[in-house]
Each structure stands twice: as C-alpha cells, then as structure tokens.
Regions:
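Amphipathic alpha-helical coiled-coil segments
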Residues: 39-54, 128, 132-152, 162, ...
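Bacterial N-terminal signal peptides
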Residues: 7-14
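Periplasmic alpha-helical coiled-coil/stalk elements that build and connect Gram-negative outer-membrane
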Residues: 2, 25, 131-243, 255, ...
C-alpha cells in the first residue's frame, strides 16, 4: 500500500511537470504564432524579391510579338472617279526580339541598394522580434502577478469575514464596542472592492496574454524571476555588447548606406546608357505586291539624357540632404543606445535592491501581524480592532508589492537584453 501511494504521488508530480508551461515555452509560442512577427517576416520576403527584380536588369530580355489583321475595303475609286479593283490582304506578322542593356551606370548601385535592403529587413525583423518577445514576457509575468494578487485579495476577504464574525461574537460578550464591529465591516467592504479590482485586472491580463502569445491555462504557468539566459555582469560589458548588437544602430547604419546608393543612382540618370537588340520578323500576305518577308534587324542604341529642366540635379541635391539626415540619425541612435543601456542597467540594479527590501518588509509584516492578531484574539493584550486592521493592511500591501517587485525584477533583466540587442530568438534558443 505504501509503494502504491508513493507511485501515485510520483506519477502526479511527473504529470504536473509535463503539463506545466514555462516562460521559454510561452516565448516559443509567441515567436511562432504572433501575427505582427509573421507580418514582418513577409517584409523580408518582399526585400528578397526586390533583389531578384533588380538582378533581372543584368539579363537579356526576349519578346515574341504576333499580330493578325483582316482588311475589308468597301469602296475604292481612282483619280477619274471610276471604281478601282479591290485587292484586300490579311497580313500576319510574327517577330522575336532579344535585347541586352550594355551600359547602365545606375543598375549596379540599385542592385547594391537592394542587397542592403535585405540586411535592413533582417535587422528590422530582429527588432520586431525583440518587441514581441518583450511583450510576451510582460504578458506572461503580468498574468502570473495579477493571479497572485487576486489570490492575496481573496484570502484577505476571507480573513476580514472571519474577523467580522469574531468581533460580533466578542461584541455579544462585551469584549469590544459597536464601533469596533463597524470598523471590521468597513474593512471588509474595502477588501471586497480590492478583490473585485484584482479580478478585473486578471481578466484584462489574460486577454492580453492570449493576444500576444495564445490560449493559456493559468494553472499551468510556472513562475520565474530569473532570466532563462545569461545577462551582462557589468555596465561596461553591456555597453560593449550593445555596440555590436543594438538593432537601432544597425538599422541607422544600413539606412545611411542606402542613402549613399541613392545619390549614385540619381547621378547615373545624367550618364549615357547603351543597349543592343536583335529582332527577327516574318510577315505573310505583306501587301498586294509582296506575299512573304523575313528579315533580321541588329540595332545598337545609345541614349544620353543631358537635360531635363533641372529635375535630375534637384534629385541629386535632395538625396544629398537625405544622406546628411541619415548621418544625424545614426549619431543620435548611437547616443540613445548608450543612454538606454545605462538606464536599463541602473533599473536592473534598483529593482533587485527594491525586491530584497520588499522581501524583508513582507517577513517583518508577517511576524508583526501574527503577534498583533494573537494578542487581539487572546483578549489579554491592549490590541484593538483598529490595530489588527492596520496590521492586515500593511501585510496585504507588502505581499502585493512583493508580487509587483518580483515581476519588475524579471522585466528589468529582459529589458537590459532588449537594450543591448540580445532579446532575440537565437540568443534565447527559441528555434
């Protein structure tokens, strides 16, 4: 019998662990199914197709053209006004044309710009990854925290109900006054209001979780206050990592490179272009005189658009200004990166210190509440109903503060990774 009970509890434990959902599993779910992230992945595919379109400019084009017409002359007169003989024809024309651009100073720059565009799309995808994964962490930790606070408030309501019943009994015995019972009733009403508020917050956070991550069974979520990956151990290392990985900086660098290519493309509009074409055509029932004709045409074309009313020079000036703008944005991104990493590091340190303080606060509040409640119930001490209410309130606030501070500490760790540029699927091992 003892072995049977042991086996049952082991099976129950294994089943519980198997069905539990960790933050890693939630992040994988968000990574694979989030709509915003999937939309950004399509943007990468668009950039890849743009490169293929630009690459086609280097290849020859082939065109086949066929036309067929039918003539039906209703009346034909000669110069003297008499009727002339009518000889209608039904011409058929078929041609195939091969054309190759030989010189185009802009297509090389355009091709390089599209290659940069793929790198840019990848960086934007990684940035969107960070945003969605951080939202998922917020949703995951937020749902757990609101569930904890709902449970804390539920237990507080039960405690207030028990206290009110005790005070009513003590009132009948003459141990407390009617005002003490009124205080307990007021305290219960306040506890019920907070409980209702916590229930509403839980529902809101559950909806947010389902929107960002997907469906969830709240009872399967495992709480964690430590990041699932290593975080930098110093501010200096965090800053150095951000210089390599920060996506905003990388995006600004790539957009600057694209602006430089736009200048080259604009200048190429003032340069000559050259193309070569070969066309073979076949005509049947060509005219009343000739029946068939087959000919080949080899054609070389050189074009030099040297004047367009100042439009092309204005385009060059415009792109020069865009380049200056992108340079300024890059400088600003570098400065913001330093500020964000430093702020994230400071927030992590302060949230950890605050968490330790709140833990000590909860422990002290529990000891104080236990002692005050025991004195009050014994009737031997000088503790009043108000003392118990205040003690319960301090403990409640400390417990809720602990739930919030544990979540804030977890978010601070991931926010540091986000500011560095490491809150990605590859670093978190989501693939």
């Amino acid at each position: 019998m003892k072995n049977l009970i042991t086996t049952f509890f082991i099976s129950l434990l294994l089943f519980g662990n198997a069905s539990a959902q960790t933050i890693l599993q939630a992040l994988k779910q968000a990574y694979n199914g989030n709509v915003e992230l999937n939309a950004e992945r399509e943007n990468l595919i668009v950039s890849e197709q743009d490169l293929k379109i630009t690459r086609s400019e280097y290849l020859p084009s082939a065109t086949i053209t066929t036309s067929k017409s039918q003539e039906d002359t209703n009346k034909l007169t000669n110069q003297s006004g008499g009727d002339a003989s009518i000889s209608d024809i039904d011409p058929l024309s078929t041609s195939i044309k091969l054309e190759q651009t030989l010189i185009d100073f802009g297509r090389g720059a355009d091709y390089q710009k599209k290659k940069i565009g793929i790198d840019l799309a990848i960086k934007k995808l990684l940035k969107k990854e960070q945003e969605i994964l951080y939202k998922a962490i917020e949703a995951y930790s937020g749902l757990i925290a609101t569930k904890e606070k709902e449970e804390i408030n539920r237990k507080n309501v039960e405690l207030k109900i028990s206290q009110l019943e005790t005070d009513k009994i003590r009132l009948e015995r003459g141990e407390v006054k009617l005002s003490d019972v009124a205080q307990s009733e007021s305290s219960l009403a306040g506890a019920e209001a907070k409980y209702i508020q916590s229930q509403n917050e839980f529902v809101t956070n559950k909806l947010n979780y389902e929107n960002v991550i997907g469906k969830v069974d709240i009872n399967t979520l495992q709480k964690s206050i430590q990041a699932i990956v290593n975080i930098p151990i110093s501010l200096e290392s965090a800053i150095e990592l951000s210089k390599i990985n920060n996506h905003d900086v990388k995006i600004a660098e790539l957009e600057l490179k694209q602006a430089e290519k736009d200048i080259t493309i604009a200048k190429s509009d003032l340069a000559p272009t050259a193309s070569l074409s070969l066309e073979r055509s076949y005509n049947e029932d060509l005219s009343t005189t000739y029946d068939e004709r087959e000919k080949d045409v080899l054609k070389a074309t050189v074009s030099w658009p040297f004047y367009s009313g100042g439009k092309k020079f204005a385009t060059i000036d415009k792109n020069q200004s865009i380049k200056v703008r992108q340079r300024l944005l890059l400088d600003n991104a570098i400065k913001n990166n330093l500020t964000e990493v430093t702020s994230a590091w400071a927030n992590l340190q302060s949230s950890e210190s605050f968490l330790n303080s709140v833990r000590a606060q909860v422990k002290a509040a529990e000891i104080a509440n236990e002692g005050i409640t025991a004195e009050y119930l014994s009737g031997a001490g000088s503790r009043s109903t108000l003392d118990v209410i205040q003690s319960n309130s301090l403990l409640l606030n400390a417990q809720i503060s602990l739930a919030d501070s544990e979540r804030n500490y977890l978010l601070a760790q991931y926010n540091l990774l986000k500011s560095i540029g490491l809150l990605t699927s590859s670093y978190l091992n989501l693939k």
